[in-house]
């Protein structure tokens, strides 16, 4: 008989904030296994945010930005009798955060000419204020789901 696996336990947080979401953001920013570089980018971005925000709480801005970017619904393709329908589906919590990290990283990298830490800080600040490209992406995904609401009865 197979041994019972340990399953998924709680992940460790990051060093400075001891927060699991910040650790996941660092992992999302990381390229080619260079975690020290990714950690420096994220912490520098948080320092920039702390200097720009009155209360100085970068973690609160980050959490608000994540909440504003994470999508509630998305469309999934399903083939029904020769036609492909875009079916709106609720997004599971783990995918919501993964999409939010992905979009924040993607649209921060597209911003013009400064360091990645400055671009990430600008994107997080914009996202916390319901602005920026990552929030537009979330709104676009929600609009697609709203437009295809008629096909919701085809759920998987």
Curated annotation (Swiss-Prot):
This is Small ribosomal subunit protein uS7. GO terms for biological process: translation. It comes from Chlorobaculum tepidum (strain ATCC 49652 / DSM 12025 / NBRC 103806 / TLS) (Chlorobium tepidum). InterPro entries: Ribosomal_uS7 (IPR000235), Ribosomal_uS7_bac/org-type (IPR005717), Ribosomal_uS7_dom (IPR023798), Ribosomal_uS7_dom_sf (IPR036823). GO terms for cellular component: small ribosomal subunit. Gene3D superfamilies: Ribosomal protein S7 domain. The lineage of its organism: Bacteria, Pseudomonadati, Chlorobiota, Chlorobiia, Chlorobiales. Belongs to the universal ribosomal protein uS7 family. Pfam families: Ribosomal_S7.
């Amino acid at each position: 008989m197979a041994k019972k696996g340990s399953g998924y336990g709680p992940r460790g947080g990051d060093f400075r904030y001891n927060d699991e979401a910040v650790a996941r953001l660092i992992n999302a920013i990381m390229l080619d296994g260079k975690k020290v570089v990714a950690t420096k980018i994220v912490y520098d971005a948080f320092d920039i945010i702390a200097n720009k925000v009155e209360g100085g709480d970068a973690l609160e801005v980050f959490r608000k930005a994540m909440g504003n970017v994470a999508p509630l619904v998305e469309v999934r393709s399903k083939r029904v009798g020769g036609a492909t329908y875009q079916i709106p589906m609720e997004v599971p919590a783990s995918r919501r955060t993964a999409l939010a990290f992905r979009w924040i990283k993607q649209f921060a990298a597209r911003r013009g000419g400064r360091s990645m830490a400055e671009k990430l800080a600008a994107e997080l600040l914009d996202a916390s204020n319901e602005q920026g490209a990552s929030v537009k992406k979330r709104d676009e995904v929600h609009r697609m789901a709203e437009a295809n609401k008629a096909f919701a009865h085809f759920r998987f």
